[in-house]
C-alpha cells in the first residue's frame, strides 16, 4: 500500500511533521524536495500540514508561496518572537505552542491562528492552557473555546 492510500483514510487528520531544519545533517535541497512532496500530498489528500521548522523561515515561506496551499499549514512547537509570528500569521500560517513560548508570539497568533500542544513533554496540556491563558490575560474558558474553534479546520466530525 502506498503512502497516499494510507493517509487518505479517515483515521489520518494531517500530514506531518514535514520539516525544514538548518541544524539537520540532510542537505537543505533534499529537505525542500521532501517537504514539497509532503506539502503536495497534503493538498492532494485535503489534509492540514504539520510543520517542523528550525531556522529555515525564508525557505519555508518560499515553499508556501510555491505551493499556494488551500489546506492549513501549522507550525509545530513555535518558539519564535512576535515579529516572526506576525509575519507568518500574515502569510496564513497557524502557530502551535507548547510549554515554552514567547508571549508576544502568542499575541500575534491570537485568536484565529493559535493551537496548543504538549509534544509528549512532562507538562500536561491543562498546564499549557493555564500558562497561555495567563500570558494572554484571558479566562482559560475563553482560550478553550477559541482553540476548539481553531481545531475545526481539521473537520474531525465528517
Indicate where each model-derived feature is located.
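Divalent metal-binding pocket/active-site signature
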Residues: 4-90, 138
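Active-site regions of enzymes building and remodeling cell-envelope glycoconjugates
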Residues: 12, 92-93, 112-114
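His/Asp/Glu-enriched short active-site or ligand-binding loop at hydrolase and phosphoryl-transfer sites
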Residues: 92-104
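Domain-scale detector for complete catalytic domains at protein termini or as standalone homologs
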Residues: 109, 124-128, 147
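Short acidic/histidine-rich active-site segments
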Residues: 112-124
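Structural detector of well-ordered beta-strand residues that form the stable sheet scaffold
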Residues: 50, 74, 94-96, 115-117
